[in-house]
Amino acid sequence: LGEECVTSDSAPPLVLVHGLLDTPAVFNALKRELAGGRHPLLIPALPLRLGRTPTMEAAELLGGHIEAAFGRDQPIDLLGFSMGGVIGRCWLQLLGGLGRTRRFFSVGSPQQGTLTARPWPSRVFSGIADLRNGSALLERLNGDLDGLQRIECHSFYSA
């Protein structure tokens, strides 16, 4: 599945980031609900390769999609679902996305890690390994939350 970008005159754009085993189709119902009310809308297809793609690499790809669709300076709102929320935070906190983001929504994302990532071998599934409790990536993200205080953040999680 390819990247999907729907445009209109209203701003700011909304970027939706899918999770580990998902595609942009996971947002079809949300897209229908937003029809006509929230555009431009960008839903990039990130090649997560069942967790083989490192999370930072996915965040770099996300940044490339955002820049290609909206340039370098257009403010955006960002919503990440599941692993997409962690990918979004990497882009925000480690790759400069905070400077252009107005709001960040994390839905069902393992921001503190998940035990389900433990059994997978790190050398093969580095993206999944990044989601382990206490991983170097999550420690780095959670060790410096000051930048997130400059934007409106919402986290929704259910266990």
What residues fall within each predicted segment?
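Short beta-strand-to-loop junctions in surface cap/lid or active-site-entrance loops
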Residues: 1-11
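Short, proline-enriched alpha-helix->beta-strand connector loops that line the catalytic pocket
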Residues: 11-12, 147-153
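Serine-dependent carboxylesterase/thioesterase catalytic core
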Residues: 14-20, 25, 34-147
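Conserved strand-to-loop "acid loop" that flanks and positions the catalytic carboxylate
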Residues: 20, 155-159
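Short amphipathic alpha-helix
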Residues: 29-30
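Generic structural hydrophobic/aromatic packing signal, biased to beta-strands
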Residues: 141, 153-156
